[in-house]
Amino acid sequence: MDRLLFGDNQFFGINHMSEEKARAQAMRFQRTEAIMEVLDEAYDAGIHTFMCTTHDRIASVAERVRAAPDRYGDFTFYPCMPYAHKYANAVTDHGMVGAIRHFLPDDGFLSTVLAGGKALATREVDGIARLLIDMEMKMFAGLRAPVVFIQNVFTDLLLGMGFTRAFRIFDDHIREKYGAEPAYITMNMPMLLDALEREGITRPIICSNINKIGFRMSGGFDAYLDALQSGRVRAVAMSVYASGAIPADEAIHWISELPGVESIVFGASSAANIRGTKALVDRYMGAPA
């Protein structure tokens, strides 16, 4: 993985410290052209990996990249699925079963499962999960996507429900069908790491909040440091600036000295902030091994 990954929170009005700034960003990035302008700034600064949700707007970005292979020859996507609001809206509009029908192909598969009762439905959970993953991955067809994440909303929901077998299904399918590395976003890295290991998933790629002041690091600051020092996890650090509470130089320097942190993901909407973070990561972390 590259040392520095570019995230997409800023494009969809997500800011953990300022609702006003979040609203302004949501307005600014209503057009795909505005998103592409910022992505071009990042790409030209040497940040070639875009860690993004499977929002419908990202499909438009993928189309732009696919249509210009000479311009975006090194552009890499790290899809993060599923986009939670898309499914929540479908459940609201169509109900739970209707939502599943909405996203699955219309080939009678779901009707067969439902007609077969609980036993058949239980056996077919794997098949439904794989079909939903494939639907999410469609927008990245023909594009470089070597790492695929489960979004934290779903990761932590599955973790809380104790349905950790879903992680095994995801892991196997991403490796077998897409030749990619499965990865996980969570708000509680120590708990998730233990759960993944119980499913036989070792040294997973986990993206979580990691910063000097413990901002939004559920599970305990010391537990994160213990996991990183153990060598059991390949970490992607997010919220390294703690939404602006830590000076940039101090934040990156601290992260660079942690074992087990392979990458940092950050979001920015100005060329100055993009280039500033890139310079700090180059200074303290260097090029990927």
Task: Please tell me what each predicted stretch does.
Residues 1-26, 90-121:
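N-terminal small/glycine-rich loop or linker at the start of catalytic domains
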Residues 1-3, 62-71, 131-143, 193-197:
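Short amphipathic alpha-helices and their capping/turn segments at secondary-structure boundaries
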Residues 1-72, 254, 258:
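N-terminal binding-site loop/beta-alpha segment at the start of enzyme catalytic domains
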Residues 17-33, 113-132, 160, 241-246:
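Active-site mouth loops of central-metabolism enzymes
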Residues 27-38, 55-64, 126-137, 162-172, ...:
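Well-ordered, non-membrane alpha-helical segments in soluble/globular domains
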Residues 75-88:
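A short, structured active-site edge motif that brings together acidic residues
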Residues 85, 137, 141-146, 153-289:
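Beta/alpha (TIM)-barrel catalytic core signal, keyed to glycine-rich beta->alpha loops juxtaposed to Asp/Glu
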Residues 98-155:
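Active-site gating/metal-coordination segments in enzymes
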